[in-house]
Amino acid sequence: MAVRIRLKRFGAKKRPFYRIVVADSRSPRDGRFIDEIGYYNPIAQPAEIKIDVEKAKKWLSVGAQPSDTVKSLFKKEGIIGNSASQ
């Protein structure tokens, strides 16, 4: 089972709000997930990012692959370094 850390979309039309979740790569975007590790609100000024660092590091250590967007959010929050290739 390939596990990914990715965004799950919530919110109304044109007003997205995302939860950062750990899910099986075969699950649909808004489908089943294993664990919720934070949220991302791009509409807020400045954008609101809240991540449980302990959970994120735990999932990265067991081999979960972050999506490109989640990887950039992790870099902003300092969870993974800019030179780290996940």
From Swiss-Prot:
Pfam families: Ribosomal_S16 (PF00886). One of its GO terms (cellular component) is small ribosomal subunit. PROSITE patterns: RIBOSOMAL_S16. Gene3D superfamilies: 3.30.1320.10. InterPro entries: Ribosomal_bS16, Ribosomal_bS16_CS, Ribosomal_bS16_dom_sf. Keywords: Ribonucleoprotein, Ribosomal protein. SUPFAM superfamilies: Ribosomal protein S16. GO terms for biological process: translation. GO terms for molecular function: structural constituent of ribosome. NCBIfam families: S16 (TIGR00002). Belongs to the bacterial ribosomal protein bS16 family. This is Small ribosomal subunit protein bS16. It comes from Thermoanaerobacter pseudethanolicus (strain ATCC 33223 / 39E) (Clostridium thermohydrosulfuricum). The gene is rpsP.
